[in-house]
Swiss-Prot record:
This is Nucleotide sugar transporter SLC35D2. One of its GO terms (cellular component) is Golgi membrane. Residues 1-11 have a biased composition (Basic residues). It holds the Pfam family TPT. It is a multi-pass membrane protein. One of its GO terms (molecular function) is pyrimidine nucleotide-sugar transmembrane transporter activity. Belongs to the TPT transporter family. SLC35D subfamily. The gene is SLC35D2. Its main location: Golgi. Residues 60-68, 178-184, 238-253, 304-314 are extracellular.
Length: 355
């Protein structure tokens, strides 16, 4: 009798690995199926981000340059109001969540509202003053400034390859600027200020998001909400509001459509960025942004209407573009190596646990 029990026990022990193997196979098939189902969503999210980030530059350029709308401040104000309205409705419908306003919220957001305002207004003003190729190339300084900001605020380090490609982008920008026949000092000053503010804003947003106090929607909502009244006051006292009211293009349906689109595109771009990062990664978002900038550069040369061609400028633009492509490749490679290293570490930990 004891022998029979021993045999049954041995049989059960022998079957266990087979069952475990079957379960593992089913789990792997389930994971593969889930990955297949999300491929379309990943592509859709990346495409949505690319189209959104492309449209906001083109539409802002059209409103401020082609239609000669006189007030960058009022465009920025419209974007703030649209952001607050969309997020407020989203919260009321329980589509998005963020904390209610209380006395601690200003402390939790500071200095982001000021950076948000400065970033938005300088970006719009430089869009108005610069042709699209130079705008996109000079925006690459934001990568350099972001590296400095993340190094100081987040103690982040960067590889030699990343530093060299950023250096190539900057050299290309200098070469292009040296022969920019449409040079506008105000536009250059504002785009460089915008680059600094973009870098500081990005680093502080990451710092605030890591604390998980307000979340990404809360930060965006309160950044816009806190700056509506100051922006309105500045627009009133500088005469921008009066210029906007007296603008003759309000009767033009096509202008109204583009102005409205410009107002809502700020929120749409933010949402598209979140979706792309959620379904793909921050890396994919960066690469899509890089490809978008390349398209804007070449399209701006042909259709922008304010680009003046010179060989030196053209060569500088292409040096900067080549640097951005290599930057994307190196970033992608480093990300893949990092993921592979993490996966190997997890396997090692599991192996040690099994032993």
């Amino acid at each position: 009798m004891a022998e029979v029990h021993r045999r049954q026990h041995a049989r059960v022990k022998g079957e266990a690995p087979a069952k475990s193997s079957t379960l593992r196979d089913e789990e792997e098939l389930g994971m593969a199926s889930a990955e297949t189902l999300t491929v379309f969503l990943k592509l859709l999210a990346a495409g949505f981000y690319g189209v959104s980030s492309f449209l906001i530059v083109v539409v802002n350029k059209s409103v401020l340059t082609n239609y000669r709308f006189p007030s960058s401040l009022c465009v920025g104000l419209g974007q703030m109001v649209a952001t607050v309205a969309v997020l407020w409705v989203g919260k009321a419908l329980r589509v998005v969540k963020f904390p209610d306003l209380d006395r601690n919220v200003p402390r939790k957001t500071f200095p982001l509202p000021l950076l948000y305002f400065g970033n938005q207004i300088t970006g719009l003003f430089s869009t108005k003053k610069l042709n699209l190729p130079m705008f996109t190339v000079l925006r690459r300084f934001s990568i350099l400034f972001t590296m400095f900001a993340e190094g100081v605020l987040l103690k982040k380090t960067f590889s030699w390859g990343i530093k060299m490609t950023v250096f190539a982008m900057i050299i290309g920008a200098f070469v292009a600027a040296s022969s920019d026949l449409a040079f506008d000092l105000e536009g250059y000053v504002f785009i460089l200020i915008n680059d600094v503010l973009t870098a500081a804003n990005g680093a502080y947003v990451k710092q605030k998001l890591d604390s998980k106090e307000l979340g990404k929607y809360g930060l965006l909502y309160y950044n816009a909400l806190f700056m509506i009244l100051p922006t309105l006051a500045i627009a009133y006292f500088t005469g921008d509001a009066q210029k906007a009211v007296e603008f003759e293009g309000w009767a033009d349906t096509l202008f109204l459509l583009q102005f409205t689109l410009s107002c809502v595109m700020g929120f749409i771009l933010m949402y598209a960025t979140v979706l792309c990062t959620q379904y793909n990664s921050a890396l994919t978002t960066t690469i899509v942004g890089c490809i978008k900038n390349i398209l804007i550069t070449y399209i701006g040369m042909v259709f922008g209407g304010d680009y003046i061609f010179t060989w030196t400028n053209f060569i500088g633009l292409n040096i900067s573009i080549a640097g951005s492509l290599v930057y994307s490749y190196i970033t992608f490679t480093e990300e893949q190596l990092s993921k592979q290293s993490e996966a190997n570490n997890k396997l090692d930990i599991k192996g040690k646990g099994a032993v």
